[in-house]
Every structure is written in structure tokens, then in C-alpha cells.
Swiss-Prot record:
Protein's UniProt keywords contain Ribosomal protein: no
Organism (species): Macaca fascicularis (Crab-eating macaque)
Signal peptide: none
Cellular component, GO, one term: plasma membrane
Main function: ATP-dependent RNA helicase which is a subunit of the eIF4F complex involved in cap recognition and is required for mRNA binding to ribosome. In the current model of translation initiation, eIF4A unwinds RNA secondary structures in the 5'-UTR of mRNAs which is necessary to allow efficient binding of the small ribosomal subunit, and subsequent scanning for the initiator codon. As a result, promotes cell proliferation and growth.
Spans annotated as Disordered: 1-21
Subunit structure comment from the entry: eIF4F is a multi-subunit complex, the composition of which varies with external and internal environmental conditions. It is composed of at least EIF4A, EIF4E and EIF4G1/EIF4G3. Interacts with PAIP1, EIF4E and UPF2. Found in a complex with XPO7, EIF4A1, ARHGAP1, VPS26A, VPS29, VPS35 and SFN. May interact with NOM1. Interacts with PDCD4; this interferes with the interaction between EIF4A and EIF4G. Interacts with RBM4. Interacts with DDX3X in an RNA-independent manner.
Lineage, highest ranks first: Eukaryota, Metazoa, Chordata, Craniata, Vertebrata
Family per record: Belongs to the DEAD box helicase family. eIF4A subfamily.
Phosphoserine: residues carrying this PTM: 4
Domain of life from the UniProt record: Eukaryota
Catalytic activity: ATP + H2O = ADP + phosphate + H(+)
Protein's name in the database: Eukaryotic initiation factor 4A-I
Length: 406
């Protein structure tokens, strides 16, 4: 059933998700049931089997224009169902009888690409759709064989490997009709902008373009003008972007060298189901992990210097719960859905304030409550105030009873 945009409903999504911030949109159709989206029966079965009951606010607004073929810029908080928004749209549009790649999804990290692939496969479970993760760090020959022998309906990948496969003509753009950029702010930042543009040049001029992300600074919106045609905009106001359901605190540590003792004190105070500790450099991740192990605290480490197999093992252990604390760089801050994470510790405040929401979004996804604790030295106080202003939020000093909140 559709309603006008003016009603600006704040319905709960799957699993009692907290209401999302009001979405600003130039699209006036809100469809509050998957049954009313004219989706195929087999796709609907996959959606309900996956555990969705009702579309989240972003899904109510963005799925329909995506299916209708419009270029779409969709913005919503982490954990509100952005991945399923484009996965459902792709699965509805592909022709299963056509054994050719028809949709291309790009993600900034290998882990996120693999997670998107899993969501697509799960939602399309009853359709027989094929989806392949085309990522760096894996065997090129096996990749080429897969693309040539099978031509999967959907490719999810990282920019470097995808461009390589397109450039060497192992991946054909001939039938690609939908191009999705997930975590678009990261993808279009300095590191990936040129690669994205090169990939886009190889696609058909009438290819539909969909961008999704939690943050979309104005310079990114400028870049989208280069390769999007009158896009539908579905945006959350900036001041409503910080996550509801996440309690945010800071600990005053004055000096950098006191952070380690403070972290160990926290460990002893809290019963942690699962936690992610964010640090700004790879070298410091290794340093902190060693220091924690020396003090008999268990923790796993993950960063971009590790090879893909090692990263896969660490993520598997963390997802299964056999490892409870993960120390990482911003590599993990982009959309990795680890359901049990109740606590995020920013050992270092992010150097880019827009990464803050990606980091603390690890706790409280789909309405699960979470706590974020920021370790703040004298030098960090200005950065903390800057984050508070940017997100129009309040980060309070950590109370003594923090253990009761996790």
C-alpha cells in the first residue's frame, strides 16, 4: 500500500528495528509491505525466509524506484537494510534465463563484498540466481575460469579486481543494466574515484546507477552529477544521522600512554558479549594486540596488511562468537554486520569524522542496543566536540555504572 511522502511514516522495520530518521526525498511513494511491491513469488519467499517481516524506512522508499529503473541516491543509517534494498531490486530485475552478468555491485572492502554476496544469495535462494564475489586477494586464474564458464547473473566486487576483469574482457559489460555503489562516500573518495569512473566508462550509457551510503557529503553529491541522470534522492537529514539506540560516552585519559591501562580496566569491569576496538593504524593494531595478549586478555586483530585467507578466518571466528574482541582499523567500519556486537571502543578517534558513524554502527543494528566508548586525550577533545557538532549529538563522560548499560 502506498502513502504520500507527506505522511513521513516512522514505521519499525524487521525485528522491531528502531524508527529511522525522517527521510528527505524527491520520490513520493512509500510502500509499507513487501507484498505490495509486485515482487516475484520466489523472491518474496527468500525475503521472508531471510527474516524480514516489513520493509524498513529506506526499503519502503527506495526499492520501487530502483525496480522501475531510475538512477537512485539512497542514504540511511548503518543497519537499516540498505544492502537488502539493492539486492531485492537487482533480483527482481534480472532475467534468470539469460546466462550473462546483468548487475554489478561495487564495495570498498573485500569483506563487505563477500557479505553482500551472502545477502544476495540468501534473498535469491528460491530463484536460482547466481552471484559471484570478484575480489582482490583471490586466485586470478580461478576467477577468470568462473567468469568465462558461468557468467554469473550478479557480480559483487572491489574496484581493482572488477576493473581488471572488465579491462581484460573476462567480465562482459554487454548485458549489465544495473550498477550499484555501496558505501558510496568511501567509494568516491580520493582512493576509488578514478577507478569507479574507469569502470563506468566501460558500461553501456543507459546503465542504471544506484548509490547507497550512510553519509553523503556535498562533494560526493557533486561527483554523482558526472554519471547519474536526474537521480531520485532519498536522503536522511545530517543531524538525524547518528544512531538511535547507541549510547555514546567518552573516557578522559589525558595522555596517549594511559589508554592501555584504561582499556585493561574496562575489560575487567565489563562482561563483554562481543566488542570491536578501532585504531587508526595497522602497526598500532598489532602493537595493542601484543600488549593485550601479554596481559592475558584475549583479542583478535585484523587489518589490510593481512592476506585474504587470514582475514576470512578471523572474521569467521568473530562472527561465530569463538573470538569475542576484535581490534581493527577502519577496514571493518564499513557495513560489516556482526550481529552480537554490543560494544564499540574507539581507542583512537577516527581521523575522518564521517567514519565515526560507520564505526559506532557496529552496535545496535536493526534496533539492537549498543554502547560506544571513546578514549579521549587532551589533544582529542577538539575532535570530539567536532564530532558532536557534525552529528548534532551529545557524547557524555562515561558513568561508573557503564557495565549495567551493556
Amino acid at each position: 500500500m502506498s502513502a504520500s511522502q507527506d505522511s513521513r511514516s516512522r514505521d519499525n522495520g524487521p525485528d522491531g528495528m528502531e524508527p529511522e530518521g525522517v527521510i528527505e526525498s524527491n520520490w513520493n511513494e512509500i510502500v509499507d509491505s513487501f507484498d505490495d511491491m509486485n515482487l516475484s513469488e520466489s523472491l518474496l519467499r527468500g525475503i521472508y525466509a531471510y527474516g524480514f517481516e516489513k520493509p524498513s524506512a529506506i526499503q519502503q522508499r527506495a526499492i520501487l524506484p530502483c525496480i522501475k529503473g531510475y538512477d537512485v541516491i539512497a542514504q540511511a543509517q548503518s543497519g537499516t537494510g540498505k544492502t537488502a534494498t539493492f539486492a531485492i531490486s537487482i533480483l527482481q530485475q534480472i532475467e534468470l534465463d539469460l546466462k550473462a552478468t546483468q548487475a554489478l555491485v561495487l564495495a570498498p572492502t573485500r569483506e563487505l563484498a563477500q557479505q553482500i554476496q551472502k545477502v544476495v544469495m540468501a534473498l535469491g535462494d528460491y530463484m536460482g540466481a547466481s552471484c559471484h564475489a570478484c575480489i582482490g586477494g583471490t586466485n586470478v586464474r580461478a576467477e577468470v575460469q568462473k567468469l568465462q564458464m558461468e557468467a554469473p547473473h550478479i557480480i559483487v566486487g572491489t574496484p581493482g579486481r572488477v576493473f581488471d576483469m572488465l579491462n581484460r574482457r573476462y567480465l562482459s559489460p554487454k548485458y549489465i543494466k544495473m550498477f550499484v555503489l555501496d558505501e558510496a562516500d568511501e567509494m568516491l573518495s580520493r582512493g576509488f574515484k578514478d577507478q569507479i569512473y574507469d569502470i563506468f566508462q566501460k558500461l553501456n550509457s543507459n546503465t542504471q546507477v544506484v548509490l547507497l551510503s550512510a553519509t553523503m557529503p556535498s562533494d560526493v553529491l557533486e561527483v554523482t552529477k558526472k554519471f547519474m541522470r536526474d537521480p531520485i534522492r532519498i536522503l536522511v537529514k545530517k543531524e538525524e544521522l547518528t544512531l538511535e539506540g547507541i549510547r555514546q560516552f567518552y573516557i578522559n585519559v589525558e595522555r596517549e600512554e594511559w589508554k592501555l591501562d584504561t582499556l585493561c580496566d574496562l575489560y575487567e569491569t565489563l562482561t563483554i558479549t562481543q566488542a570491536v576496538i578501532f585504531i587508526n593504524t595497522r602497526r598500532k593494531v598489532d602493537w595493542l594486540t601484543e600488549k593485550m595478549h601479554a596481559r592475558d586478555f584475549t583479542a583478535s586483530a585484523m587489518h589490510g596488511d593481512m592476506d585474504q585467507k587470514e582475514r576470512d578466518v578471523i572474521m569467521r571466528e568473530f562472527r561465530s562468537g569463538s573470538s569475542r574482541v576484535l581490534i581493527t582499523t577502519d577496514l571493518l567500519a564499513r557495513g560489516i554486520d556482526v550481529q552480537q556486537v554490543s560494544l564499540v571502543i574507539n581507542y583512537d578517534l577516527p581521523t575522518n569524522r564521517e567514519n565515526y558513524i560507520h564505526r559506532i554502527g557496529r552496535g545496535g543494528r536493526f534496533g539492537r542496543k549498543g554502547v560506544a566508548i571513546n578514549m579521549v586525550t587532551e589533544e582529542d577533545k577538539r575532535t570530539l566536540r567536532d564530532i558532536e557538532t557534525f552529528y548534532n549529538t551529545s557524547i557524555e563522560e562515561m558513568p561508573l555504572n557503564v557495565a549495567d548499560l551493556i
